[in-house]
Design a protein with these regions (language model features):
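Rhodanese-like catalytic fold shared by cysteine-dependent sulfurtransferases
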Residues: 2-4, 21-138, 157-192, 196-252, ...
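Short, solvent-exposed interaction modules
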Residues: 149
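Bacterial N-terminal signal peptides
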Residues: 8-17
């Protein structure tokens, strides 16, 4: 009997060991950060995301996942490029998507941030930098007449979403594999750019190319973001297909050819756009704050598409690109061609935040009597907010208290979570999802009356 118990115990231990071995640890650093940095234990590197001062929390995006961190304003240290009045102001100054390093401590099963460092601008000597105005002149001349070699050293996936005209893609992480693609003339002007002022890939490329003996290399520090604020970019037909169409990434695809010609063959999803009707188009165009990717198509990728794209950029849109070679290049690449009637109205719906519930779905469920929902409405606002009204039947747990009150949350029911503006609800979503709860969150704003009625923005 004792032997049988011992064998069972050993087998159980073996199973636990195998399960532990199979559970791969979560990455502490975004892949792009590993190009230039190592991450010490107790640290995270990624992109700053939502900030919820009401619950003393923020989240960091690490590739396709999120980490939720708590903080105490009395003890948290925040380092930003520009000084701030206090911790709250410093955190608010960090733009969404900005690269950060966070040092944290584990307390009661939660990560508590003790240091947040916003990545500062890269340091490039004045003689090693090229400004926007000089780059504009060179791009207008072209590589042959301007005698330059422009390199986009971002990862290929980013390059395919749009690049500075005339650039070639030599990603910094694969620099050593692409040495043979550099100019034979080691005195030729080589210009590197990447993802902007905080990106180390172009300075890193500069250092490597200098070590190979190239004497005339520079960095466009503002990178693709700096170019896109002033000018249109370009992308090839295969890039359009791979980066947007195959992945079903929302975009605005504008065909500026005459309707009669375009209807004989166009890229699926295209909307016809009259080059003389920009003012009318902008009245129904998605708001610039949504940052819709825009691709403009004409017959050859020539002046017609370029002029139309320039007008969109001047109207405040970034991420505007011209299809290199136009529709002819699309056909030459043997890519799918649609015929018939093009769209006439621009419709752009940003990709929903992972885990979000649509406003219509939330409204439909929350409007039902609590006994008919079959769903838990979780309100994670603070008591000073919920005292003025809650959705009838909602479970109220302030977001900072979630981990201590898990026993109140059912594991066998769907949970729809909300706060007042979506930020704390998303923090709650990531915390509970990681624990196995069936949860979604409302990403937008909601106003709840004392009667329990609610209005969605």
């Amino acid at each position: 009997m004792k032997l049988r118990s011992l064998i069972s115990l050993c087998l159980a231990g073996a199973c636990l060991s195998l399960a532990a071995a199979d559970a791969s640890p979560k990455a502490a650093s975004a892949k792009i950060c590993t190009t230039c940095h190592t991450t010490d234990p107790g640290n995270l590197r990624g992109n700053f995301d939502n900030l919820a001062l009401k619950s003393s929390s923020f989240q960091v995006r690490i590739d396709d996942r999120f980490e939720v961190l708590r903080f105490d304003q009395a003890s948290l240290k925040v380092v930003t490029p520009e000084p701030a009045a206090d911790v709250a102001a410093a955190l608010r100054s960090i733009a969404k998507g900005h690269e950060v390093r966070v040092q944290y401590l584990e307390k009661a099963g939660e990560k508590v941030a003790v240091l947040v460092v916003a990545k500062p601008p890269v340091k490039v000597a004045a003689g090693d930098a090229i400004g926007l105005e000089e780059l504009e002149k060179l791009v207008a001349l072209g590589p042959d007449q301007g005698n330059y070699f422009l390199v986009d050293c971002r990862p290929t996936a980013r390059f395919m979403e749009g690049a500075i005209p005339t650039a070639v893609n030599l990603p910094f992480p694969a620099f050593d594999k692409n040495v043979d693609k550099l100019p034979a003339d080691k005195h030729k002007l080589i210009i590197y750019y990447c993802s902007g002022k905080t990106c180390n890939m172009s300075p890193g490329s500069l250092q490597k190319v200098r070590a190979l003996g190239y004497t005339h290399a520079k960095v466009f520090v503002d990178g693709m973001p700096g170019w896109a604020r002033k000018h249109e970019g370009v992308l090839s037909p295969p890039s359009l297909k791979a980066a947007y169409l195959d992945s079903q990434t929302p975009l605005v695809l504008l065909d500026v050819r005459p309707v009669a010609a375009a209807s004989k063959g166009f890229i699926q999803g295209s909307v016809t756009a009259d080059p003389t009707g920009m003012a009318a188009l902008l009245k129904t165009f998605p708001a610039a704050r949504l940052k819709p990717p825009v691709v403009v198509v004409d017959e050859t990728g020539g002046e017609g598409a370029q002029a139309f794209a320039r007008d969109l950029v001047q109207a405040g849109y970034t991420g505007v690109n011209v299809l290199t070679g136009g529709f002819r290049a699309w056909q030459a690449a043997a890519l799918p061609v649609a015929t018939g009637t093009l769209g006439t109205k621009v419709v752009f719906t940003p990709r929903p935040r992972p885990g979000s519930v649509s406003p219509d779905e939330f409204t439909r469920i929350a409007s039902l009597a609590p006994t008919l929902r079959g769903v838990v409405i979780l309100d994670v606002r603070n008591p000073d907010e919920t005292q003025h009204g809650t959705i009838k039947g909602a479970l109220t747990i302030p977001e900072p208290q979630l981990m201590a009150r898990l026993s109140e949350l059912p594991k066998d029911k769907r949970i729809l979570c909300h706060c007042s503006g979506g930020v704390r609800a998303e923090l709650a979503y990531h915390l509970l999802k990681d624990l196995g709860y069936d949860i979604q969150f409302l990403a937008g704003e909601i106003t709840i009356l004392e009667s329990g009625e609610f209005l969605l923005d």
